């Protein structure tokens, strides 16, 4: 009988491999004071093995925890909690003999062998925790069959016999039909987690006559199996899990060799020497013993590194599996019979897995006596997590192949349901078939839902339903077909297919595909892709992480998406490349830079997303998702819906990458350097129509938190008749209402009669209300003229009588940022007056700057470098009434650094403004057009977290230069708001400050990794060209070192701060 003499100690099984001691203590600590938490870990990998022991101070607390927590979910997995138990006969040195056997059982190590009725699955042993707790290892059957190598059996199977037994005797002694009570396997303190009900071992001391062994190994021998013990005499509750019988007792004869201590030697007791039937199950023993090998016709070359046993499970090798998930297999290069061979002699131990039972046949593989490798590679971590799958190079009959060799869909589904798995590359041929050599994944007319290749390879659906898996590069040929040799996912007529690698999952990683791939549904055509013999990874690439998030995928080949008639709803390029829709529906994915040509077309060679007449298209890279990143696009792109025109983009041969994060949130669209147009019908778009001008409006129109990198062209929005419900500018540029409904983009709004309730500029530009309704988006700098008017050319927000207006960029929401405005801006409500600012014809950025994050939290507002007045009446401002003086800084013609630096975290929480270097017109300079470097460099990481951004060197209106060129903020914005991105440096002349039309080397070289290095370097250190200094300017330095310090006046390196003083700086 079993007793719980340590009721305060609990066994916790079935843990998620990510669960650690802290999580266990936090979860169970609510029931009472915990003395100790012991999580079993693999010695080699130091990863959790899926079970632990928690010792409470009070047995009552332990009992309550076991009652409440058993079966509950912890970190996504149902756990088992029970009190550890101890047998009535506690012994860590002796195992009672099997009753009626005439000899003592010697197999005290964990096995899954032993006689049992075929209706009872094997008991899967697992190593104990070094303290004798074997744990509940049979509760969740291990789904993956184990690959095997031939060779001598492991040394840790049992203690050596004193007399050599004949092979036949040993064969019978380990026969499958044996009915008996398994000997107790104890740990260091006598505890163990469970007791296999059916277990048999070899004789202990002397050879037993063949008849005796035959009786022991026979199927008719009743009896009880000894309990499996931990090293302190305790075990978990009985788990009555039967073991399937072996077909042929002669198929396996173990050579009795000691088990190596290199994995679990840390748990051995120095003075512990096993006696007779004693021995710990996976190397938790005091000393190793060398035993004489015994010949057998099914001998094994290498020691057993897993926890198998005769008959119940084939011995396996490689890193011991992490039960409950995380199994890792070593390479397999042979042929092995994974299922019963109907009495035929095989080269390896027949295995009956607990996954299914079908008339004594293996649920996974049945070879009709033919040699085949198991499905051991497949589904190695099918239900678990963090498994590592080593490469497989053999042939495997993973499904019922009628004697045909086939590798299972195990690769395609190595991490089918789990997370964090890793799938190594597969280079063989694979068939998963249930009948007639066809796959079990779809059992209809011998065809599979997932893969049927007619001899081709298939590794599709690598992380079909799971999350976090990684699909390493696939270099073979793969096909997916459902019926008639055609697949709802992929059919390539011999082409390769690795589509839909993470179709529904999250966080998967799809490595680059270098073969040909096609997807087709019926008639050789797919709802996703058909290329008429062209290469296609179709929606696989276009949608490698279609529904998930955080995936990343690179595409370097040619891809086609077509639905019917060679045309695709996603992409059709007439032989061109297509990698569109990379993360169309997902979130957080990363689309690596695309440098080829891509097209999207739906019908008639035209797509609702993109049609370029041979041009490139990578539009909609993160259309519906959030948080993804679209790396820089350097080709030409077009979007068109019908008649060569798209509701998103039509450029008459121009480039289009609009709508990069149209509906999503948090995505990033890296800088666009081409020309973009959007048009819906008749060459006109509800979003953008520019008559040949460029348009990148509405980049994040409906989403939130996305970023649209700088816009450098002309943009227009029009709906019908050249007019848009959002924008109408009579041919002028418009990027108003960028985040009218979402966050972060730019757009113009015009409602009716060419007038917009938000913006109407009578031909002027408008970028008003950039984040009017959204939250958290960012509006990149606007460099044109903008007006807002509601009726009669006047707007409830801004009217400037021809002046520019970017007022009220985020008046009502929180968290948005409005990038600096460098033109003229006025806010007026009625009669040309503004409730925020009216300057009597003077320039005004009104309260928009002052209120860029007025209502939100944590945002930063970039500085304004024009002349600004905030006044309510008589040219005076309610914010600061200084007689038309500037409220923040006024230097009477002197140069001054704006208070933008002084207020780097003026309104937000924890943000850091990088310092500004140069002379700035941020304050009132007496009307002088003094030189000024923009704050773009000062703000490379101004808004984001951990990102870097390289500078830009071209002519910019970023500072007031009296009509001269100055650098724009484009490079300053490459990763301006995001987190962790890295933008490669640019080499050219930097007009970042006003240099009198002279060229100036950018600071980009000093800052290519400027946040992680912390070096104070200016100029171009790679070329040794320092950045020229202007007379009267403060010393330049590396403002991106994250030191939080500013350079002292003396020009030293880090450590100092600017002094506050009159004329030079407000710090």
From Swiss-Prot:
Compositionally biased tracts (Low complexity): 366-378, 400-416, 453-464, 530-546
RRM domain location: 8-86
Organism (species): Homo sapiens (Human)
Biased composition (Basic and acidic residues): 285-304, 379-398, 417-450, 547-563, 816-825, 860-895, 995-1023, 1056-1067
Spans annotated as Disordered: 90-131, 144-175, 267-305, 357-1067
Pfam families attached to this UniProt entry: RRM_1
Protein name, entry field: RNA-binding motif protein, X-linked-like-3
Gene of this entry: RBMXL3
GO BP term (any one): mRNA splicing, via spliceosome
Matches recorded under PROSITE patterns: RRM
